[in-house]
Structure formats: structure tokens, C-alpha cells
Amino acid sequence: MSMRRSKAEGKRSLRELSEEEEEEEETEDEDTFEEEEALEKKQKGKATSSSGVCQVESCTADMSKAKQYHKRHKVCQFHAKAPHVRISGLHQRFCQQCSRFHALSEFDEAKRSCRRRLAGHNERRRKSTTD
């Protein structure tokens, strides 16, 4: 057995190399197109959320200058911290943990996080102290 290979066996033909390069370019073009599409979708989503309105009935707060957090959750700063608000005819409060409005019955006294989330938080705290 010889360690030497013929030129035909040891080297790829120029045609094979150019075909591979074309395939790579096509793949790169597809990836770029998909990235551009994703970016466009992301930008479209941002445009609609920046002109949001507070969820609370009869709230006329200007959300265009609100923090991104408040725009994302469609709640003005005042109502995010209010002890109770009226949404769909129900008295509710904004939960800081869930970033949603819940019925007042889901909160303990004047707390701003619902019982369910507070229970999970307390459970995690207890586990870390016993370790």
C-alpha cells in the first residue's frame, strides 16, 4: 500500500469547491433574510406598544412619555401603584410580581404582590435559609 494518493483522489475538483461555495452563499442569504424579517417584526411590535393606553377605565394618562415597563404592561405609573382601580367593572390591583391586575381578594391588606406569588417567594426564602 502506498501512502501517496493520486492528484484526482487527494484534491477536490474546482467544480466541487465552487458548488460548495455557492451553497454556503445561498445559506447565508437565507439566514440574512430571516434575520431581517425577525427584526422587522420586532420593530413593528415596538411601534404599536409605544402608543399604548392605560387599561384602567377612564384613564387619560399620556403613555408616550411613560417608562418602557409601563408601556409594555399598558398601565400608567399612577395606576400601577394605586391601592385599587376599576377594570371591566371590577375592583382590582396591579401585582408587581405578575405584572397583571388581580381582584382585590387575591392580595393581603395593602400589599402590591398577590398571595400566590408571595407564597412562592417566601418558600424560596425558607429553602435558602435551611441550606
Curated annotation (Swiss-Prot):
One Pfam family, short name: SBP
GO biological process: cell differentiation; flower development; inflorescence development; positive regulation of flower development; regulation of vegetative phase change; vegetative to reproductive phase transition of meristem
Source organism superkingdom: Eukaryota
Positions of the UniProt region annotated as Disordered: 1-54
Keyword annotations: Cytoplasm, Developmental protein, Differentiation, DNA-binding, Flowering, Metal-binding, Nucleus, Transcription, Transcription regulation, Zinc, Zinc-finger
Cofactor: Zn(2+)
Knocked-out gene: effects: Plants flower early and have a significantly reduced number of juvenile, adult and cauline leaves, with a shorter petiole and a more acute leaf base in the first two leaves.
Keyword Nucleus: yes
Positions of SBP-type zinc fingers: 51-128
Stretch list, region Sufficient and necessary for DNA binding: 45-129
Composition bias type Basic and acidic residues, residue spans: 1-17
Record-listed Zn(2+) 1 binding positions: 54, 59, 76, 79
Tissue expression pattern: Expressed in vegetative and inflorescence apical meristems, floral meristems, leaf and flower organ primordia, inflorescence stem tissue and to lower extent in roots.
Protein name: Squamosa promoter-binding-like protein 3
Organism of this sequence: Arabidopsis thaliana (Mouse-ear cress)
